UniProtKB/Swiss-Prot annotation:
Localization in the cell: Postsynaptic cell membrane; Cell membrane
Gene Ontology process terms (BP): acetylcholine receptor signaling pathway; associative learning; B cell activation; behavioral response to ethanol; behavioral response to nicotine; calcium ion transport; chemical synaptic transmission; cognition
Family per similarity comment: Belongs to the ligand-gated ion channel (TC 1.A.9) family. Acetylcholine receptor (TC 1.A.9.1) subfamily. Alpha-7/CHRNA7 sub-subfamily.
Organism: Macaca mulatta (Rhesus macaque)
Binding site for Ca(2+): R42, V44, S172, Y210
Catalyzed reactions per annotation: Ca(2+)(in) = Ca(2+)(out); K(+)(in) = K(+)(out); Na(+)(in) = Na(+)(out); choline(out) = choline(in)
InterPro entries: Neur_chan_lig-bd, Neur_chan_lig-bd_sf, Neur_channel, Neuro-gated_channel_TM_sf, Neuro_actylchol_rec, Neurotrans-gated_channel_TM, Neurotransmitter_ion_chnl_CS, Nicotinic_acetylcholine_rcpt
Designated name of the protein: Neuronal acetylcholine receptor subunit alpha-7
Amino acid sequence: MRCSQGGVWLALAASLLHVSLQGEFQRKLYKELVKNYNPLERPVANDSQPLTVYFSLSLLQIMDVDEKNQVLTTNIWLQMSWTDHYLQWNVSEYPGVKTVRFPDGQIWKPDILLYNSADERFDATFHTNVLVNSSGHCQYLPPGIFKSSCYIDVRWFPFDVQHCKLKFGSWSYGGWSLDLQMQEADISGYIPSGEWDLVGIPGKRSEKFYECCKEPYPDVTFTVTMRRRTLYYGLNLLIPCVLISALALLVFLLPADSGEKISLGITVLLSLTVFMLLVAEIMPATSDSVPLIAQYFASTMIIVGLSVVVTVIVLQYHHHDPDGGKMPKWTRVILLNWCAWFLRMKRPGEDKVRPACQHKQRRCSLASVEMSAVAPPPASNGNLLYIGFRGLDGMHCAPTPDSGVVCGRMACSPTHDEHLLHGGQPPEGDPDLAKILEEVRYIANRFRCQDESEAVCSEWKFAACVVDRLCLMAFSVFTIICTIGILMSAPNFVEAVSKDFA
């Protein structure tokens, strides 16, 4: 029992002695390493040889892409490693001490910065400790939220792919003093973004010569390639715009008598203007390229604007004043003949044929009316009823040998009657008959003028219907072509639709 307790106490004392010796070795090692160490001195064995620094990064998150200010915000961990000739020791002389850590400013480290930084502090990294092992290998892993300037190409927005460069290099050391070598970027810990899909982050090492110095300045450039996810913009911008474009076509289906054709066109035009303002708020104020969605909105606004102009013409045709003159011959030929035939449109009542009355030929003349004046009054009144309404539409039907009534009207003799109705003197007889004949002339002329005015108005209204139908077909085809042609012109349209809308 006493022997076992003694063994436990011996083991505990040995472990405490080992810890105390290790802490003593670390303290001694730190003193030896920083003794006569100058953090401004480049840690190489031969000053004529460059110090090789390996550089890489680990992308964790794409935090924001500011299209208007053209700034990319990312969460990145930098990875830098080099060999410090003055920070080496023999592990056997310092047992248990394999690695040591030095804070910022105590040992030398490369001054690698982001060249295209858009941050106010320029250096956005958090200065962590430098990890050093016994062979002098130094590893520096500073994390940071980087804001870099990036040219945002909005040519294919919202089906665009952006390429933002992150250029890193030493600020004060040239290629003869510091040899910067690239290692592949790490995206194993990347957190997916709701707005962007990370395509890749390839890197490239290059050297650049400046006018101040003869030596080259190496740099490592990583290109963050990302594709915009279009589901949000499709549901909030594209689909509403397509629906509004379809509403613009309803202007041509709305009857002209409703009085709302112009109002509908102006409302659709204002709706598109609101969507254009939404796009302008997020797009950069650049004249290098016009966004794809802006092109689509502009084409749609042109269609709606032209529809409003055409609607004004249609309303002018529909409400044309008959006293303003008849339709020009070329307008009648183009609209009422060619376009109406092409659109398979016919005038209202054009196919209606009045039934022919099967009666024997009756010749009614004013002479017979005059002869009937001496007859009983009922006979003369019955004949006078037809005298007043003969030729109301300005057409006089010639008598036929088989039937005396054609197209629902009596075939009257055009010789003596027309002479009387157009100012001829009635035969001598009853003066009341002359007054009645004068009233009949006035009524016939009045109805004839009304029929002519109605015919002119009907002709203009039919022309308005033809223009409406023609513009409906033309604008529908143009809208479909613009929608398919503009949106599908994006290089990755199919990929975006298959991934985001599937």
